[in-house]
């Protein structure tokens, strides 16, 4: 009996101990709220350096975070709280900006309104909405530090609100991203709208994601999580976030 206990004790000593400083794996919380006002949260450990709002695209599969979960979990590991507003219950079925604002406001309250910069990233329709959202976030007392617009879509002014960019804070940094196998029409439209509103050109950068090897830089490449997506999409967002901390 004593010999068995001693053997167990020695085995326990030989096993690697868990590091007390190791952060827990990112955990999705929610959805909180109802209908188009619903949202999901992820919390950085031990405390956030930034809050990132992730605006999704126009598709049934985008109404929950699973298309972007790898990118979101990467952001959490980098020290960001993340908010994923649902903003609609069917594609183009709700006033996207209104429900985004409601979801973001209640999410920030749930997070305790951390006194850190807020960055918005959006994909496809959400890429355009991300810039428009930054222009109306003053309504919930938020001054966004930066926006990354990934493969933004064009505006259908018959169905969607036309946002006046004159309220977009001139301190906000904008990064508009296009792909070499995707239409740049949405980014060009955003640039024209920004110029008309006299937004400072020096606060706007553009980047092109390039096809490389088996990586095809088309509209759906933002849903990938391989090495090229990480290098050409994840890393630029990481740098943008770091620049406003």
Model-found features: residue ranges?
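C-terminal catalytic histidine-bearing segment of alpha/beta-hydrolase fold enzymes
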Residues: 201-245
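Conserved alpha/beta-hydrolase
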Residues: 72-91
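Bacterial N-terminal signal peptides
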Residues: 5-14
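The feature captures the conserved acid-bearing segment of alpha/beta-hydrolase catalytic domains
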Residues: 145-213
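Short, surface-exposed "cap/lid" segments of acyl-processing enzymes
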Residues: 45-75
């Amino acid at each position: 009996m004593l010999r068995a206990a001693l053997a167990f004790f020695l085995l326990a000593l030989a096993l690697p101990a868990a590091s007390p400083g190791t952060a827990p794996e990112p955990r999705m919380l929610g959805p909180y709220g109802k209908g188009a006002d619903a949202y999901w949260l992820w919390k950085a450990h031990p405390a956030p350096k930034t809050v990132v709002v992730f605006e999704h695209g126009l598709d049934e599969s985008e109404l929950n975070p699973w298309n972007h979960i790898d990118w979101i979990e990467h952001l959490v590991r980098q020290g960001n709280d993340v908010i994923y507003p649902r903003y609609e219950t069917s594609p183009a079925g709700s006033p996207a900006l209104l429900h985004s604002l409601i979801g973001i406001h209640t999410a920030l309250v749930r997070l305790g309104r951390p006194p850190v910069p807020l960055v918005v990233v959006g994909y496809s329709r959400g890429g355009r909405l991300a810039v428009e959202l930054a222009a109306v976030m003053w309504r919930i007392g938020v001054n966004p530090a930066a926006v990354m617009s990934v493969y933004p879509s064009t505006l259908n002014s018959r169905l969607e609100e036309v946002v006046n960019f004159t309220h977009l804070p001139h301190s906000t940094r904008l990064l508009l991203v296009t792909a070499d196998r995707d239409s740049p029409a949405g980014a060009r439209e955003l640039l024209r709208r920004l110029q008309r509103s006299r937004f400072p050109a020096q606060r706007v950068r553009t980047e092109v994601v390039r096809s490389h090897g088996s990586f095809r830089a088309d509209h759906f490449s933002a849903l990938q999580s391989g090495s090229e997506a990480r290098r050409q999409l994840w890393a630029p967002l990481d740098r943008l976030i770091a620049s406003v901390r």
